[in-house]
Amino acid sequence: MVDVEGKYSPRLANKRGAARLAAVQALYQMDIVGSGVMETAAEYEAYRLGKDIDGDQYLDADFQWFLAIITGVVKDQKQLDPMLNQQLSAEWSLSRLDSILRAILRAGLWELINRQDVPIAVVMSEYVDIAKAFFEGDEPKLVNAILDSMAKKIRLLK
């Protein structure tokens, strides 16, 4: 969504959208800190989702959706990462990408594979919007291109 000044302004998130954003943040946290899924999930449920943190209000999120994403990504990461690496150039492997970008791509790909009930356009739009919230460069375009390519391959196989 673009505001009157031509700048990106994120849409108000629904509970699933808020869960996706929180899941990306949790995956990033687990990647950086090395915390486990259940520890991170408990922290988000108790102290983050729908809570006020240092004057910022976390959006209320669908906790079950959040939990499904983070547990699914961690469980399936050995399958997701090679699929994502195939979409990247030889010079830019998944390990070279920013941690938050890796989290966005992993969560988006996991949802494309495992949540066939969610339209492709919704998954792509949500994760591109998350990328726009974190990046001002070409990263959202990269997320769009990779998820679009993967969606075509995945949905053809199913």
Curated annotation (Swiss-Prot):
The UniProt record lists the keyword Transcription regulation: yes
One cellular component term from this protein's GO annotations in UniProt: cytosol
HAMAP family: NusB
Molecular-function GO terms, alphabetical: RNA binding
Family, as annotated: Belongs to the NusB family.
Organism field: Bartonella henselae (strain ATCC 49882 / DSM 28221 / CCUG 30454 / Houston 1) (Rochalimaea henselae)
InterPro entries in UniProt: NusB-like_sf, NusB_fam, NusB_RsmB_TIM44
Gene from which the chain derives: nusB
SUPFAM superfamilies, alphabetized: NusB-like (SSF48013)
Protein name in the entry: Transcription antitermination protein NusB
Domain of life: Bacteria
Keywords from the UniProt entry: RNA-binding, Transcription, Transcription antitermination, Transcription regulation
